[in-house]
Design a protein with these regions (language model features):
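Rossmann-like dinucleotide-binding cores of NAD(P)H-dependent redox enzymes
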Residues: 71-78, 157-158, 163-167, 173-234, ...
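Short hydrophobic core segments
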Residues: 7-9, 97, 123-134, 168-169, ...
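N-terminal Rossmann-like dinucleotide/flavin-binding domain of flavoprotein oxidoreductases
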Residues: 2, 40-126, 202-228, 354-355, ...
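A Rossmann-like FAD-binding core segment of flavoenzymes
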Residues: 91-94, 98-113, 124, 185-284, ...
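Flexible, glycine-rich terminal cap/loop adjacent to redox cofactors
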Residues: 9-11, 17-35, 40, 47, ...
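FAD-site-proximal beta/loop scaffold in flavoenzymes
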Residues: 146-164, 246-247, 251-324, 396
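Conserved small/polar residues in nucleotide/adenosyl-binding loops
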Residues: 583-585
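Beta1-alpha1 glycine-rich phosphate/pyrophosphate-binding loop at the start
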Residues: 4-6, 11-76, 181-201, 487
Length: 585
């Protein structure tokens, strides 16, 4: 099939997005994928999961919910996606690729490739190689696991079966969503999580509220519980926990870990020595560290980099495409949303205390303990250099995620701590200290139950916390648990990314009656004069202004940050376009 400007290995969200964008820029592009074009998200993950959750919320029967799921996923038919790529000018090759040398790939054709019989090996040449092969499930080391009826998350989301008794192993996002799905449709669900709480990578209150909701749906939850042995029984299976508890079920659903899919890619031919389960190291421009040279470049996007979620994969793909096309662009991970689409849903973004607590050495421990634990719920690939679903689970992922964001959050000239500088009091607790130059977090909380919207719906189950950088006066992170939280927390993502001062955010008017009004309570607390107010330090603010002047965005004065006068708002409106010009999602 010859030479191409760009060869993309992997046809999931990241691979398809890169291929389409780069082909639109005039490059000759080949995309290599043996499975479904579009990856797991539209067929076996995000879309079928959300479809079933919505059907459950409407009180639909299981049979009708499965039929709707089939419609949403197109019956696992990717022909429409294939046609879109072809129209975009992308050459799609059904097969698996392996790097044989810098600039060279061999593709073993898979069934369904029309150009030649399956098994045929086709050589390709490239100038730019994009690794976007996603992630794969990791089976936990449980004695007898291979002898019992077990599902992966993907298998559970394409099966027509509704087990009478189901064990879900893993209390991360997918484990919680699947627990709610099957419990809502009548299964007796037991959720097993090795950590002491659900969603261990987020602040404790998020997992506690969600656990209460799942219990009300009928699920039984085992926290701090490690599965040790599985046995087949005449009517199903029995799962034994380390504390001696035994749980009977008809099927086990494994939602306890995934790892980057890098095996068999021939990365050693690029000079890369990748430890199994580890993510690819990349630069801020998503170029694979140590893999380029000799006139070729190697990029990575999506789960292979340890950056989770479909929207994060799409974002990285945009960064890769821009750089391939000559538009130099750095990725900014400071405001990537994380969502759990349960009822109530969980939304988080930026730096949060739960992740900050794990930022010390959890990532290193996770790498050392590869595959030694189970039931941790890290069903998505962990942060760069870590394995999801290990002993520290989502806490390890959160630790690396926080380290990455803390590096981004540091202002110019603040690589070293300022001796003697103390954080102001915080409520209810401050986040990471600044011995390494990272932000000091101040927390403000608001209950959704205090909003008229919640009272109208007779639903007081919800809470949000905002985390502000005490020195710069901008938001650093947020977590919200409540109905459809992702839909009304988007403004927080923008605020973190654009570094909008808290004092300006506190002056924003929210429609009545909405859950968004709860944001006003927390923002006014942060912008007020109490213990939770943020007070920008002169040193940090001067660094912010210097950085903005260098970028030509126009600095804000100290007075402007502390008092949202009209001229401050005017100056900040001038700042926003330049800041947001970096975002091309």
């Amino acid at each position: 099939m010859g030479a191409f400007d760009v060869v993309v290995l992997g046809g999931g969200t990241a691979g398809v997005h890169v291929a389409t964008e780069v082909a639109g820029g005039g490059k000759a592009v080949a995309l290599v994928e043996a499975g479904l074009i579009g990856g797991e998200s539209p067929y076996l993950a995000c879309l079928p999961s959300n479809s079933l959750l919505l059907s459950a919320a409407r009180g639909t029967s299981w049979e009708d919910a499965v039929a709707r799921r089939t419609d949403v996923t197109g019956g696992l038919d990717d022909s429409a996606a294939l046609r879109r790529l072809s129209r975009a000018g992308v050459t799609v090759i059904r097969g698996t690729g392996r790097v044989t040398a810098p600039g060279a790939v061999e593709v073993t054709l898979a069934p369904g490739e029309e150009s030649a019989p399956a098994g045929t090996v086709v050589p390709l040449a490239y100038t730019d190689l994009v690794l976007a092969t996603g992630c794969e499930p990791v089976a936990p080391p449980i004695e007898g696991l291979s002898d019992i009826p077990a599902w992966t998350t993907a298998e559970s989301l394409c099966s027509p079966d509704l087990p009478r008794r189901l064990i879900v192993l893993g209390g991360g996002p997918a484990g919680c969503e699947l627990t709610q799905i099957y419990a809502s449709f009548g299964s007796q669900v037991s959720l097993v999580e090795a950590d002491q709480r659900l969603l261990p990578g987020e602040p404790a209150f998020a997992g506690e509220i969600l656990a209460a909701a799942l219990r009300r749906a009928g699920a039984e939850i085992y926290l701090g519980s490690r599965a040790t042995k599985a046995e087949r029984t005449p009517d199903g299976l029995t799962l034994a926990l380390a504390d001696g508890t035994r749980i009977d079920a008809d099927r086990l659903l494994l939602a306890s870990g995934r790892r980057p899919r890098l095996g068999g890619l021939g990365l050693d031919a690029l000079g890369l020595d990748i430890t199994p389960g580890m993510a690819l190291p990349t630069t801020t421009r998503c170029e694979v560290v140590g893999a380029g040279g000799d006139g070729v470049r190697v990029w990575a996007a999506g789960d292979v980099t340890g950056t989770t979620h479909t929207h994060a994969s799409r974002y990285q793909a945009g960064v890769v495409a821009a750089n391939i096309l000559g538009d130099a662009r750095d990725a900014d991970y400071s405001a990537l949303p994380r969502c759990v689409f349960t009822i109530p849903s969980v939304f988080s973004v930026g730096i949060v205390p739960g992740a900050a607590e794990a930022a010390g050495d959890a990532g290193t421990e996770a790498a050392d303990d590869s595959g030694t634990e189970n039931g941790t719920g890290a069903e998505t690939a962990a942060g760069p250099g870590n394995i999801a679903g290990t002993g520290n689970g989502l806490a390890a992922e959160a630790g690396e995620r926080t380290r990455r964001m803390l590096r981004i959050a540091r202002m110019p000239g603040e690589d070293q701590a300022q001796p003697g500088h103390q954080a102001p009091p915080a409520h209810p607790a401050s986040g990471p200290g600044s011995s390494d130059g990272s932000p000091r977090l101040v927390t403000a909380r608001a209950s959704l139950g205090d909003t008229v919207r919640a009272q109208l719906g007779q639903d007081d189950l919800g809470c949000l916390e905002l985390y502000a950088d005490a020195e710069s006066g901008v938001l650093a992170g947020a977590v919200a648990v409540g109905p459809d939280a992702a839909s009304w927390m988007g403004e927080v993502t923008l605020a973190i990314r654009a570094k909008i001062p808290v004092t300006i955010l506190a002056d924003v008017v929210h429609a009545f009656p909405t859950y968004g009004e709860a944001l006003e309570t927390a923002l006014r607390e942060l912008a007020g004069t109490g213990a939770s107010a943020v007070r920008p330090s002169t040193a940090r603010h001067n660094a912010v202004m210097a950085d903005q002047e260098e970028k030509g965005t126009g600095p804000l004065s100290e007075q402007d940050i502390e008092t949202p006068e009209d001229d401050a708002i005017e100056q900040h409106q001038e700042l926003i376009p330049d800041e947001l010009s970096l975002i091309h999602i």
